[in-house]
Swiss-Prot record:
EC number per UniProt: 2.1.1.163, 2.1.1.201
Catalytic activity: a 2-demethylmenaquinol + S-adenosyl-L-methionine = a menaquinol + S-adenosyl-L-homocysteine + H(+); a 2-methoxy-6-(all-trans-polyprenyl)benzene-1,4-diol + S-adenosyl-L-methionine = a 5-methoxy-2-methyl-3-(all-trans-polyprenyl)benzene-1,4-diol + S-adenosyl-L-homocysteine + H(+)
Positions contributing to S-adenosyl-L-methionine binding: 76, 97, 125-126, 142
Protein's recorded name: Ubiquinone/menaquinone biosynthesis C-methyltransferase UbiE
Family statement: Belongs to the class I-like SAM-binding methyltransferase superfamily. MenG/UbiE family.
Gene giving rise to this polypeptide: ubiE
Keywords, alphabetical: Menaquinone biosynthesis, Methyltransferase, S-adenosyl-L-methionine, Transferase, Ubiquinone biosynthesis
Amino acid sequence: MSESSEKTSTTHFGFRQVAAKDKKTLVAEVFTSVSRRYDLMNDLMSLGIHRAWKRYFVATAQVKSGDRVLDLAGGTGDIAMLLKNRVGAEGSIVLGDINASMLSVGRDRLIDRGVVARLDYVQCNAEALPFQDKCFDLVTMSFGLRNVTDKDAALREMFRVLKVGGQARVLEFSAVTAEWFKPIYDFHSFQVLPRLGRLFARDAASYRYLAESIRKHPPQEELQAMMGSAGFERCGYRNLTGGIVAIHSGYKY
């Protein structure tokens, strides 16, 4: 079932129920708050492992030199930088993010590192992408889908803009599979992480939301089914680090 406001009047913002029309604003406030410390946030949430996850996410993507790639929820540009190495000088990347602060951080970082050619920045909502049909060889989203109000709409849009034969990939925090690890993970998420957020970023509330948003995100099998419903074929996922994150893939034929 779609999470759109047309079908339900409320949705979740972490563990809170809020008006669906308000979620984008609330999420925007979180990411505006953490944008300058976004890598710190990911380091705290993953104990630094997110860098290895992202490298593997890009290394195993179906992408080649000369391809055109859309990286949604592109944040501070780390996925785009890794992708640029895959598509080469003839390839192009569009870094899309709904949050202007995140987009600005990503642009500044990539310019500072000399990554400027054939790289565009677009502020856009994943639920209604401003691109033509069938115009990207690969569409990626890393640690962004759980913050989208209408995930079904975002997946349909990813499918729409993907070329026939192309691949969509989602890297997202998921459902831990090891029973023994769940209480440890919960303690880190709900007791340690907000305190670290208060200590290092002076923002415990945003970090608490981010931990809660992981628990409200669809588990692996459910997200796989959602991708199938959006039109993707050969949908599958690979758990990393005991299911703390999962990489979901789907193809358009």
